[in-house]
Amino acid sequence: MRVARLLLCAVVATALSTTLVAQPAATGYHSVACFKAKPDSGAELRKFLTEESHKIAQGRVDTGLITTWYLLRAVLPQGSSAECDYLIVVMFPGAPHMLSQEDLTAAIKKEGLSFTAEDYVKRRNAVSTLVSVGIFQNLVLVGSAKKGDYFQVNYMKVPNVDDWVAYEKKVWKPLAEAMVKDGKADGWSLNVRVLPNGSEQPFQAVTVDVFPSWDSIFAADPQFVDRFRKVHPDMELGTTFEQFEKLRTRAQINLYELEDVITATK
């Protein structure tokens, strides 16, 4: 799961600062919204997302519309050429849905806020551009994330999604579980794109490697080979990763930091 994997192959309650976040459902749906700060509005956008958007998300969690809300800040790439400065990831308890004005108004009322839904949208649009929104299906979730973790998001071009998903579940899922158990990582997830979709899209699926710190992203893992052999005693390392290369192409890798999180209590 860390840089070693790249070499062998050639990414809720009130915000939590140190304790682990309750694990979202392993299967289901989530949305990913990409926001770009308007010129000279980076600080204002961060304040808006961590304050007003956080309160709205808390209201949506409290009313049961969503189960988890993540605010991810772009680490690499960043700057004017980066597509997203922030991602907001929302986990749903059932079928996915877009935030309607009625839902927004209900969340505002639930939290006892003084502004209206129209005020909220105007403030958001004054400091940011909503670049895109996508819907994904969660297929596998290993471990859990905490505030301050780093998310390595691996965007995959996958000709045959079923074959690739089956191989990831067979090979990488047990490895990810072992690395979480050994304290080498905080989590891993496997997700397929639902909408938008089609052959012209730049990627069809995403895996996310969750690291506990910046240094852990680049730290060597001398036990990786032994861990692989323990988990897969009947598989050969080289040919196993060669098969990964046949099943998918890593179109892009981005790095984000988990800045804020809300999850429903159980």
What are these regions (language model features)?
Residues A22-S114, D119-K266:
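Short S/T/G/P-rich N-terminal loop/turn motif that feeds into the first structured element of a domain
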Residues M1-R5:
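Positively charged n-region of N-terminal signal peptides that target proteins for export
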Residues L7-T18:
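Bacterial N-terminal signal peptides
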